[in-house]
Design a protein with these regions (language model features):
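Histidine/acidic residue-rich metal-binding segments in metalloenzymes
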Residues: 1-76
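His/Asp/Glu-enriched, well-ordered alpha-helical/loop segment
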Residues: 48, 69-70, 75-76, 81-157
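Residue-level signal for inorganic ion chemistry
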Residues: 2, 29, 79, 109, ...
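A short acidic, glycine-rich active-site loop
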Residues: 49-59, 96-100, 173-179
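Glycine/Thr-rich phosphate-binding loops of Rossmann-like dinucleotide-binding domains
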Residues: 12-13, 36, 84-86, 162, ...
Length: 196
């Protein structure tokens, strides 16, 4: 199996699309920040929007969405990359690349893909849970009697503004931005480990 990670350019989406016609062992992954933001976010958020691969154009963002729609991109991953405040306070050329993404990922997918009609909620969840679990042969990504009780309870209509993250790091362009869709509970192995 080959996984092309962090797809960010229209050309990459097309290359993967062509490769998948020749092999069923090719998978591609995109991040929520690459299907929600463009390079303009760097002007607004500075180092908080510096990542690798970098944010690109609106045409690239739309190509990623089309790739998710047609199955060219079959995985969504957060690319959660925490950095200390002092690291992200450096000038843009010196600051490390990467943002945190775990706590905003489901809300961003909900808002940018489901609410806009680009994907159904089931398609979003398939890319975020079912497909990764199958690819990496994990006993996860499904609900069944006697199966692992690992899940979140999510309110897709609830609006919230992340003022602070539970992650030790706060490097996110979504800090202080209103998002739609809130995780209310996280359950791991049948135990509530997070409650909003």
């Amino acid at each position: 199996e080959i996984v092309i990670q962090h797809i960010s350019a229209a050309e990459a989406v097309e290359l993967v699309r062509q490769a998948k016609k020749k092999s069923t062992k090719i998978h591609a992954e995109a991040t929520p920040h690459h299907f929600t933001l463009t390079e303009d976010a760097v002007m607004e958020h500075g180092t908080m929007a510096k990542m690798n691969p970098p944010l690109r154009t609106e045409a690239d963002r739309q190509a990623i969405i089309r790739g998710l729609q047609d199955g060219t991109i079959d995985l969504i991953a957060t690319d959660h990359a925490p950095h200390a405040d002092y690291e992200k306070a450096k000038p843009l050329t010196e600051a490390p690349s990467g943002i945190i993404g775990l706590e905003t990922s489901l809300a961003l997918g909900n808002e940018a893909l489901v609410d806009t009609g680009e994907l159904t909620m089931m398609q979003l969840l398939t890319c975020m849970t079912i497909n990764p679990a199958k690819l990496y042969r994990l006993d996860a990504g499904y609900l069944a009697e006697n199966g692992p009780a690992d899940l979140v309870l999510f309110d897709p209509a609830k609006e919230w503004v992340p003022e602070r993250f539970y992650s030790k790091s706060q490097n996110s362009p979504f800090l202080g931005q209103k998002l739609k869709g809130k995780v209310e509970y996280t359950i791991c192995k049948g135990k509530v480990i997070f409650e909003a």
